């Protein structure tokens, strides 16, 4: 089973690569909202590939989501 820490590490790496790609081709960087959606899409893909469970998706908060409590 894969942990949230491992998934977050991979997502951070992917976002760094994407940031460098965008800088090199001269397009705007991802917004904070883009990163929220990226996390959701990435974890959904892991679930579809049966790498993580629905329970993990339900328990894991999105580290890129803003919360004003």
Q: Where does each model-flagged region fall?
A:
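Acidic, Ser/Pro/Thr-rich low-complexity regulatory regions
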Residues: 1-69
């Amino acid at each position: 089973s894969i942990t949230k820490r491992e998934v977050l590490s991979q997502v951070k790496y992917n976002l760094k690569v994407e940031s460098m790609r965008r800088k090199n081709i001269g397009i705007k960087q991802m917004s904070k909202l883009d990163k929220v959606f990226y996390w959701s899409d990435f974890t959904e893909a892991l679930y579809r590939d049966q790498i993580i469970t629905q329970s993990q998706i339900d328990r894991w908060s999105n580290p890129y989501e803003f919360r004003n409590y």
